Curated annotation (Swiss-Prot):
Region (Disordered) location: 1-20
Function: Stimulates increases in peripheral microtubule dynamics and may increase the motility of the infected cells, contributing to cell-to-cell spread of the virus.
Organism name: Fowlpox virus (strain NVSL)
Name of this chain's protein: Protein F11 homolog
Family of this protein: Belongs to the poxviridae F11 protein family.
Domain of life of the source: Viruses
Amino acid sequence: MDTNRKRSLDEHDTGEESPGKLQIVEINDEEDITFTDNPYYKLVKSRDNSINLVPLVGCVMIKINDIKGVTDKVNKLLPKTSSKTNSTSCINIPIDSIPLNFLDDGNKYFNVSEVSILQVSHGNDMMNIDKYVDGSFDYIAVLCLKNSGRSVIMLNHCNKQHVMQDNFCLIFRSFYGINILTQIIGESVYLLVKLSPSDLFKIRWSSVIDSNRFMGKKFYIRNLQEDACIEKMKNMEKDIYKNIEFIIINSVLLEDLKSRLDITRELNHTIDKMFNHNNNTLFSDIIKLSEEIIDKDFKNMEKMSDSVLADVKQISKTKNKLRERLLKAAISSKEVEEILSDIPVIEEGTIKQFSLNQRAVYDHYKKVIYKNNSSLDLGCMNIEKSYMFNLYKVYGQNEYMITYILNLINRVKKGMDAIKSNLGDIYKYNIDNINLVVSERINKVISGESL
């Protein structure tokens, strides 16, 4: 047995009937035969010293202890620039470009005849990969070089799901169709290797090849038929993908909403400071005016002092009334509801950003001012003509926006919590990879790229 590989103890047999299961061929020549554990066949010595060869039943999962050399070679062969859109790819490479000695059987009965690199990115799959040649006795090895998320492989009419991990290799007869179900998070990179009988095997075990030819074709034809189990699992993995994508998109949305909330609150905090500054300025101006009058006519001091206090109260009363009416109008206005109706929604997997009609907002608040100023105290029109009008307008809009964003954040969080609960362990096992994808997409939003 190759010291760089070991058979997986928990996952080694599909339980499916195999044509090799019925074929036992005997020879009496032990010369140059190595009795070694391998994933393709088993050699059994009988009491009469004859040797029996029993081909693989179903499929075998083995673990390759060290694939760094293979991974380094593959990385050099992959395209330097990756596509920005999710995709799949299959790249055929020369059979001698990568060291694959860990797939040797010990007797040189099988040689590498074809090598491909498969790439599957988040949200994509590769179904019905067919490597069968009529009458062949080939094996297929699918080695997982990289999987930064969840990747499941199923063989046609074999109910077992193989959740692939780095360094694990699935080996089976070539008459099985290969299905890589929807990739969830990140990407997976596989090395697909076809192993064909060597000349030595064809000479020594020709009867095995002959006896398997018809059975292999029979199984291949069966595997071409629709597989309800695979369709069911394919749909399940797609549903998992959609739920994970929902979490990712809404996580990005939450970060966006939190940023907008912070900015809006900070803006209103600044406006509050400007209100206070304006009050102080008005008070100072009135005091200054009263002092000038008092200097001219000391007798009027008491009367003017009362006038100053009355003016200050009147200005404060006017400002507070205007502010209260503006905010009340903003909170209850159907017009503003329509203006803010585009904040933000998910359409076909993408976030539709804020698209406020600023002119409509301005016109709305102007109408609010004119509608209410007739019932306000004297001085309202002077305030309306000043910069305070714009501050009130923005402040009212922001107060409504803050309430809207907080409600939206709450709804999004509830939806995400429900999805996370449904996913259970799948979410827990992939949480780090999900957070990584969220960070990458947030950076794309910041840089102005599309999701």
